[in-house]
Amino acid sequence: MTATILVADDDAAIRTVLNQALSRAG
């Protein structure tokens, strides 16, 4: 449930982190 709250509250920040992870992976 905490993860859901974080996604809803800091969606932009999480997207940035995911983008960085995808960049490193790809």
Curated annotation (Swiss-Prot):
* InterPro entries with a match to the protein in the record: Sig_transdc_resp-reg_receiver
PTM comment text: Phosphorylated and dephosphorylated by NtrB.
A GO cellular component annotation here is:
cytoplasm
Gene Ontology BP annotations: nitrogen fixation; phosphorelay signal transduction system
Q: What PROSITE patterns does the record point to? A: RESPONSE_REGULATORY
Q: Which residues fall in a coiled-coil region? A: none
The record's keywords, sorted A to Z, are:
Activator, ATP-binding, Cytoplasm, DNA-binding, Nitrogen fixation, Nucleotide-binding, Phosphoprotein, Repressor, Transcription, Transcription regulation, Two-component regulatory system
Q: Which residues cross the membrane?
A: none
Query: Nucleotide-binding among the record's keywords?
Result: yes
Q: Where is the Response regulatory domain?
A: 4-26
- Does Transcription regulation appear among the keywords? yes
**Broad class of the protein's primary localization:** cytoplasm
**Localized where?**
Cytoplasm
Molecular function GO labels: ATP binding; DNA binding
Q: What does this protein do?
A: Member of the two-component regulatory system NtrB/NtrC, which controls expression of the nitrogen-regulated (ntr) genes in response to nitrogen limitation. Phosphorylated NtrC binds directly to DNA and stimulates the formation of open promoter-sigma54-RNA polymerase complexes.
Protein name, as recorded: DNA-binding transcriptional regulator NtrC
Q: What is the lineage of its organism?
A: Bacteria, Pseudomonadati, Pseudomonadota, Alphaproteobacteria, Hyphomicrobiales
Q: Which gene encodes it?
A: ntrC
